[in-house]
Amino acid sequence: MNVRVRFAPSPTGFVHIGSLRTALYNYLFAKKMGGEYILRVEDTDQSRLVEGAIENMLNAMKWAGVNHSEGVILDDSGKVVQKGEYGPYIQSQRLDIYQEYIKQLLDSGKAYYCFCTKERLDEVRDAQRAAGETAKYDGHCKNLSKEEVEANIKAGIPYVIRLRLPENHTIKFTDLVRGDMEFNTNDLDDQVLMKTDGFPTYHFAVVVDDYLMKITHVIRGEEWVSSTPKHVYLYEAFGWEAPVFVHLPNILNKEKKKLSKRQGDVAVEDFKKKGYLPEGLVNYVALVGWSPEDNQELFTMEELEKAFSVERVSKSGGVFDTEKLNWVNQHYIKDGDDAYLTDLAIPFLIEDGFITEEEATNKYDFLKSMISVLKEKLQYVKEVTEHASIFFGDKIEVETEEGREFLRLEHIPTLIDALREKIEKTEVLNAEFVQAMLKEIQKEYKIKGKNLFMGSRIILTGQMHGPDLPKVMEVLGKETCLNRIAYVKNNIL
């Protein structure tokens, strides 16, 4: 079997983190099976379309490294184009195809015209709910004669086309995550297949498209489980073989409720704007609902491609833990290329007023050295603005009363003079020099431990804790270190 899977989002706005995971699992499954991964755009609900959403979605997938070679793609100029032999890959461009297949269902009696108004449908559903029944279509138009249908159409009465489900019919399918599943048509609705505007519903278009595009495995969210029996019956109605279904568990918040925008960051763009690395986000998202055979937690994309299997996808929802995401992402920042991270950090530093756009160029080497020191503390790149202040300016601000009290200790004036004297004498101030210098001060002035190391840190940075001090001082340079020592002596002591 030539495995073919698809990610088929609707261009309705931001790319939810759950959509990224669905795309990722489809991509990984295709890679594992040596198959094809397709991206199709499902835009049949024209009322919900957002301008630019297709471009945003494609850019998000490109950023994440979840790449496809068939379907809707961005060319080198950033233009949306389509590539592949089963197109069009945008549903609104396939309306003639859907008309052809809806006609087949009407001719075979597997679908029917429904002329019920919205008001009537609302009344029926309200009455059913009041009686404690499941709200669904009551079949009012199910048995209209051919003459009645033709007369209504000729009179211009708006209509939809519904799937004609047989009574008391058992629909079975196997889900690779949930196992064998069984539904009775008495519990299902005669689903609308074609809307009054001539556009197909999701339920109709997805079946036609998956069949014509030779999709072998449908990997999607668990919210579609209840619709799957209707899709399976549509395959039966056409005489087609249904694909294999894989329904992924929901991504949950810490309260075990479905993750939504009301609870904070849920869009890929939200995480990108904070400076999460694509490698970190993809690595973590892969683990929300899937577990590897061993306890490995850090995966490159290549490692995920080899390790992933749908058999190890969980039935129950996976909790999105931001702290765990931060831990994973921090690993990739620590190992990240300094220049790459600096380029990501510069917009945040400009936005918070640390540097100008001109300084981003003129002081690039300085910024790169700063990032090299700070990256071990960063969970995401935007956090650079919380730690960068120690690298800017000749004056320091002691942030806490505890720090100010420390500078009142008896040995501090001696330490200040010792630091100044030794730094003045050196021509090269680097981390190795600072380490040797502190050992000399310890030996010569009998200033030890916390008194030496924390005292030096407060004098040079204003902070009691922070990145490796010798590395910080190397980035600051001789002149800035001397200016800060003088400022503390003349203005703070």
From Swiss-Prot:
Gene3D superfamilies: 1.10.10.350, HUPs. Its main location: cytoplasm. It is found in: Cytoplasm. Its EC number is 6.1.1.17. It comes from the Bacteria. One of its GO terms (biological process) is glutamyl-tRNA aminoacylation. ATP binds at residue 261. It is an enzyme of class 6 (ligase). Monomer. HAMAP family: Glu_tRNA_synth_type1. Catalyzes the attachment of glutamate to tRNA(Glu) in a two-step reaction: glutamate is first activated by ATP to form Glu-AMP and then transferred to the acceptor end of tRNA(Glu). This is Glutamate--tRNA ligase. It comes from Clostridioides difficile (strain 630) (Peptoclostridium difficile). The lineage of its organism: Bacteria, Bacillati, Bacillota, Clostridia, Peptostreptococcales. The gene is gltX.
